[in-house]
Design a protein with these regions (language model features):
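HIT superfamily nucleotide-processing domains
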Residues: 1-156
Length: 156
């Protein structure tokens, strides 16, 4: 990513965000964050939450951004629970591994619901089969997440 940023002037995550904004894989967006299912999802219903503007660290976000992050996390996780019948999941904060935050790094959160057991292909060969298109997952998760927001703000 260092070379890419130096050659192109922006990070791959910023390009992905601009591509996904209002696209078929977007689940939900707030003023400051976007949740979407990656176009090459390995796992069914996996999704990520990114700050819309390039940001290298979670620790320097504003109060408004904290509120937006809480809102998008609560609504997408609540929507996922509704769609997938309360699955267990991994929630991973991808933060810069360097002591000095690299200007190339764009922090984000990845969510991996546990809905399938790994089969022989996954275990034996490292070949993952995702039976749910990311566009289909985003459509279902987005509808459920919007219902969650309506409940949160009292507009059922």
């Amino acid at each position: 990513s260092h070379r890419y940023v130096n050659e192109n002037g922006n990070c791959p995550s910023c390009i992905a965000i601009s591509t996904e904004l209002d696209g078929p894989r977007q689940i939900l967006a707030t003023d400051n964050f976007i949740a979407f299912c990656p176009w090459a999802s390995i796992y069914p219903y996996e999704f990520a939450i990114y700050p819309k503007k390039h940001s290298t660290t979670l620790t320097k976000i504003s109060q408004k951004e904290i509120f937006d992050l809480a809102m998008i996390l609560r609504s997408t996780l609540g929507g996922m629970s509704q769609v997938l019948n309360n699955p267990s999941f991994n929630l991973i904060f991808q933060l810069s591994p360097e002591k000095k935050n690299s200007r190339q790094f764009h922090w984000h959160i990845e969510i991996y619901p546990h809905i399938n057991d790994l089969t022989g292909l996954e275990k034996g060969f490292g070949v993952f089969v995702n039976s749910i298109l990311p566009e289909t997952a985003a459509l279902k998760l987005g509808a459920a997440a919007r219902k969650e927001i309506a409940k949160i703000v009292g507009v059922e």
